[in-house]
């Protein structure tokens, strides 16, 4: 599947915490970005050009830049036609089980595969070693990859730029 660089690419960002918001704002300068989240209050904030996180650069971008950014609770609207699905959902570490809870990532990958298997799914969430390979094998695809993030809370947009 080739990407048409003459028109704006649709990118879906799943999750609107520090990682998701910084990616969404950065990419919405030159692409059509849809944020998918489970929290209606966060969706409303994004659709009103307000940040869901405390980050002065993100807040400034939302206030001052012309961004192609919308948010939705509807996974079909978010995934249909997207070239990329960026996964920025929580994977909290459970000290008792000594594991990351990857259920939100797994759910996003399952939904993306069902609704738009052509999209390249890029996992930004923290996951254990080997998890991406197990997802690739489960769905018989090479369109699920991992790209680690190294962002500081409150400086996430700046960290993405640099």
Model-identified regions with their sequence ranges:
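N-terminal FAD cofactor-binding segment of flavoenzymes
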Residues: 54
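Dinucleotide-binding Rossmann-like beta1-alpha1 core, especially the glycine-rich loop
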Residues: 156-162
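A structured beta-alpha segment of the ubiquitous adenosine-cofactor-binding alpha/beta core
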Residues: 58-83
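Conserved beta-strand segments of alpha/beta enzyme cores
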Residues: 32, 68-70, 143
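NAD(P)+-binding Rossmann beta1-loop-alpha1 motif at the extreme N-terminus of oxidoreductases
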Residues: 2-50
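Rossmann-like NAD(P)(H) cofactor-binding subdomain of soluble oxidoreductases
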Residues: 93-155
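Redox-cofactor binding/interface segments in oxidoreductases and associated redox assembly factors
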Residues: 85-87, 123
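Short, well-ordered alpha-helix to beta-strand connector turns
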Residues: 31, 81-82, 141
């Amino acid at each position: 599947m080739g990407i048409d660089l003459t028109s704006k690419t649709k990118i879906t960002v799943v999750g609107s915490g520090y990682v998701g918001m910084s990616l969404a704002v950065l990419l919405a300068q030159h692409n059509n970005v849809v944020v998918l989240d489970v929290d209606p209050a966060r969706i409303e904030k994004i659709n009103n050009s307000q940040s869901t996180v405390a980050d002065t650069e993100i807040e400034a971008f939302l206030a001052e830049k012309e961004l192609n950014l919308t948010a939705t609770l509807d996974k079909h609207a978010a995934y249909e036609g997207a070239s990329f699905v960026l996964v920025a959902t929580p994977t909290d570490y459970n000290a008792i089980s000594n594991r990351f809870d990857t259920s939100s990532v797994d759910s996003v990958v399952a939904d993306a595969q069902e609704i738009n298997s052509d999209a390249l799914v890029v996992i930004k969430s923290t996951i254990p070693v080997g998890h991406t390979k197990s997802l690739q094998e489960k769905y018989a695809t090479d369109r699920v990859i991992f790209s680690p993030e190294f962002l500081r809370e409150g400086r996430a947009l700046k960290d993405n730029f640099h």
